[in-house]
């Protein structure tokens, strides 16, 4: 079994957290081909992303309280099993409607990894130390959005999109085996109350009444929604409007994702010195700057893919700072309800991302403006919410 505080455990948790970006980003180069194969519109194909986010959000409501009662490890293994079955259904889909439904169930299983990783970190760490651990996990897991679209582009070019989902089935089985053999159970004090709808709602009500929790949640959700504006629109804009091939799109998307790695690495170095809020503000500023730069690029009429990718890299660097600090700040007041706090956080965060991503997909046509405006709006919202809620967060720290 891996011991808490070791890099091996951190790497395993990073791998579990990477399920979300891996499952989303690996098939992005295939979106235009999926649309052509099923005779679907770009808006219909975007629903495979929105359905994933809705399923991801719903799963997070369930896993936290259940794991508070039954432990992290058995719940995690069950979630991975569902993920593998749904990924196989995606590969075998015969219509866009079947793919949309299968993606929702794929997310329902895949959400267990990120929810339970947050809860495991809270079992072991708290405060700035939890923020540092989540930043390190973010730095490692950031390899997923860098490598996934490149790998997805290669698979799409050589074999087609169905093989992409078969590869995810294999990755899921490998992850389940590693968890079964190496992951220790980190929950020492299990919830005494049996899991039921009233008990779950009671936990969420307690967590949701905390003003600091809501402040961190709003900041993080805004920044995360900007990411899904990019995910929803970039495949069609960069391939259909800017002329990139699937593999070239994968490389361009990966270059943007390097920004997240850089932001996570910066956060891990600075959080002990600047504190959660200092790094959070720096990240919010980067998100706003990246969004503004993307709007300026579209307004100037630039048609190079880098005119969108580089501003998004700045935005993602900000997200790499905001995401771990926002999660750690929200989770700190709830050592005895870490699972519930993580679940509610993830549900609302993913819901915001689903709405933003669907909106960009709906308005997307023969223009990059919906994409640029979606990213910029969320970037300025992130920084604005950081400024507007400083008092709430400061009072929470004093208490």
Task: Name these PLM-found stretches.
Residues 98, 135-181:
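Helix-loop-helix hairpin linking two adjacent transmembrane segments in secondary transporters
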Residues 74-89, 169, 279-294:
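Structural signature of the two symmetry-related core transmembrane helices
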Residues 58-97:
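Conserved MFS/SLC helix-loop-helix module at the cytosolic interface between two early adjacent transmembrane helices
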Residues 60-70, 263-276:
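Helix-to-loop junctions at the C-terminal end of transmembrane segments
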Residues 37-39, 71, 92-98, 109, ...:
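Helix-breaking motifs and short loop linkers at transmembrane-helix boundaries and internal kinks
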Residues 102-143:
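Cytoplasmic helix-loop-helix junction between adjacent transmembrane helices
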Residues 82-89, 97-105, 306-312:
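Paired small-residue
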Residues 1-2, 186-217:
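Juxtamembrane intracellular "pre-TM" segments in multi-pass secondary transporters
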